[in-house]
Amino acid sequence: MLSMKNYRLAVDENGSPFVLNSKGSIDFGYITEEMNLPAAPIRVAEGLSGPKGYGLKHIVEGHEKEIINAGYDSVYDFIEDVANDFTVIKEGKSGSFLLEKGDAYHNTLFVALSREGDYWKVVSGGIFRTRYSKNKRIIHSASEAQMPSPAEGDLLPSEDYR
């Protein structure tokens, strides 16, 4: 079994150390096959700051203030919350996807599949107005996935078109 120290030594495809979640794992959440994308864990690296950066450093530098103003205690708490409880996945640019947890705004993580395809890396994230992603294609919606289809006997006579 890996120790916490060994987890801390795990690095992303660019050599940046992964951040541990509140349970001591490098996996912050999961994208499953049912979500119409390759199944893999969601991971966050320390990353790089700057406009071409990614990961925790990039989000802290560019979006920490808005995340705190939205009621989160930290960027770390924001990432963990959205990675665990996103309800919609939308198609982004250049092979990225948006994981959204909606309320008055969309709490959003931008993720991309790693080169090896073994994890989803958090590229960026923040709090965005709902119109930001309004026209982006929906890949998965938890509300649609949880709607059971009616059994054959559950159809009303007027709905039976056979």
Task: Please state what every model-predicted region is.
Residues 1-162:
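Ribonuclease/tRNase effector modules and their secretory precursors
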